[in-house]
Amino acid sequence: GFDRLIWSEHSKSDSHICLEYFSKHNDQGFPGNMSARISYAWESDRTLRIDFSASSDRETPVSLTNHNYYNLNGHQSSIKNHTIQLDANEITSIHHDFTATGDFESVINSCLDLNHEKSISALINSEDPMIKHARGLDFNYVLTKGSVVSVTNELKDLILELHTNYPGIQIYTGQHLDKPFQRYQGLCLEPQFYPCSPNHPHFPDCFIGPDKILNKFIKLRFKEGDLL
């Protein structure tokens, strides 16, 4: 994957850096000569903005994202005492092996409903069969347009707000983390196109080509909570 490759510096300043990578036709099995750029910019309101852009001379699927692990209490502690809230009424349905079925599943009034703030501990310990099978959360939520994902730490003195123009977000609670870390020591928030999008034409279009480029962003804003 692109995460294991060395990207070149395109530009930088005191508060931003832009990296680029050129993927030749049939690199990793993907058609098209593709140019990709990712920029990271630190903004004045404690916001880290990540911009993704890509263009190709042939039609090819692209879904660049960020796979950071977040822990607002510090990396030596668990994320179980965090809370999470996001505006989404559905997830993309999955088979037993976690591949997408192409259908949607309502989460309204279910254990997976995150429209109201929930503790990650309560989610992980839920008797919901899907959560038990995954041993936590590892699901793609269908974001409501303009929605915000909000994560708060145990003391409620630090809040992470995520904004994006991607149509979905994978929420993963780190249940498969291994040494030197432990399970549930980090939370992943991965804005993306829906999993398996190329195989399901009714999903939002993840293809770029000569007449269509990728322009997506992730904004991560760190806010002080009510106690500060």
Task: Locate the predicted segments by residue.
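An exposed, glycine/acidic-rich loop-and-rim segment of catalytic or binding clefts
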Residues: 1-228
